Amino acid sequence: MANTPQARKRIRRNERRAEINGNRLSRIRTFVKKVETALAGGDKTAAAEALKAAQPELARGVARGVLHKNTVARKMSRLTKRVASL
């Protein structure tokens, strides 16, 4: 139980931030999933378009502090390699 006003405020703030960050992560996962489904379908143009849309979302995740930059770099690299290999 939070005993100080500051601790109570931090709890409220953390709940709000957790919801916002969860929404951001969900949005990023959706964009990555679009690339994955296009890759599974074997459609190179759709996969390239989906990747083009996903890259700024991933970068935004880094800027907002939702994802680590190395995680995003790894994901982008792997997706780009898979799209190029189609």
Swiss-Prot record:
Key word Ribosomal protein present: yes
Pfam families: Ribosomal_S20p
A cellular-component GO term for this protein: small ribosomal subunit
UniProtKB keywords: Ribonucleoprotein, Ribosomal protein, RNA-binding, rRNA-binding
Signal peptide range in chain numbering: none
GO MF entries: small ribosomal subunit rRNA binding; structural constituent of ribosome
SUPFAM superfamilies according to UniProt: Ribosomal protein S20 (SSF46992)
Function: Binds directly to 16S ribosomal RNA.
Family: Belongs to the bacterial ribosomal protein bS20 family.
PANTHER family (UniProt xref): 30S RIBOSOMAL PROTEIN S20 (PTHR33398), SMALL RIBOSOMAL SUBUNIT PROTEIN BS20C (PTHR33398:SF1)
UniProt protein name: Small ribosomal subunit protein bS20
Protein species of origin: Novosphingobium aromaticivorans (strain ATCC 700278 / DSM 12444 / CCUG 56034 / CIP 105152 / NBRC 16084 / F199)
